[in-house]
């Protein structure tokens, strides 16, 4: 299935008047990265509330034990959230730099 390029271009012009396509793409990617950052931070806060400590401290405890299945699953989910936060922060910086270029 292909996208109707003309219809897409018209939508871009209506929603982002006087912006080049690459500027629009950078803006949309920045918006998505910020949404992802909020999602990962929310997960991180939920796990901090559940376990009463930050990931790195809790991680050492888990790795030194034989955790039950749910704790192990939380480990992977929390690790994904912490990694996602770092990745999204880096991506946001890159995209903001791109937007500042003339």
Question: Predicted segments — roles?
Answer:
Residues 5-30:
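Short, charge-rich amphipathic alpha-helices with coiled-coil/heptad character
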Residues 46-69:
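Short E/K-rich amphipathic alpha-helical oligomerization segments
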Residues 97-102:
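Short acidic DE-rich linear segments
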Residues 14, 21-23, 34, 45, ...:
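Short linear motifs at secondary-structure transitions and domain/linker junctions
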Residues 7, 21, 37-39, 59-62:
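Hydrophobic alpha-helical segments, principally membrane-spanning helices and signal/leader peptides
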Residues 23, 30, 37, 64, ...:
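Amphipathic alpha-helical coiled-coil segments with heptad-repeat character
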Residues 2:
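Accessory terminal regions of nucleic-acid processing enzymes
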Residues 26, 30-40, 44-47, 81-88, ...:
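Amphipathic alpha-helical coiled-coil segments
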């Amino acid at each position: 299935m292909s996208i109707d390029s003309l219809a897409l271009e018209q939508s871009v012009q209506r929603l982002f008047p006087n912006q080049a396509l690459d500027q629009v793409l950078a803006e949309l990617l920045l918006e998505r990265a910020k949404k992802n950052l909020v999602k990962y931070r929310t997960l991180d806060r939920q796990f901090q509330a559940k376990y009463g400590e930050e990931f790195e401290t809790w991680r050492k405890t888990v790795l030194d034990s034989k955790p039950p299945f749910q704790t192990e699953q939380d480990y992977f989910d929390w690790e994904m959230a912490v990694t996602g936060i770092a990745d999204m922060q880096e991506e946001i910086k890159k995209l903001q730099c791109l937007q500042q270029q003339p």
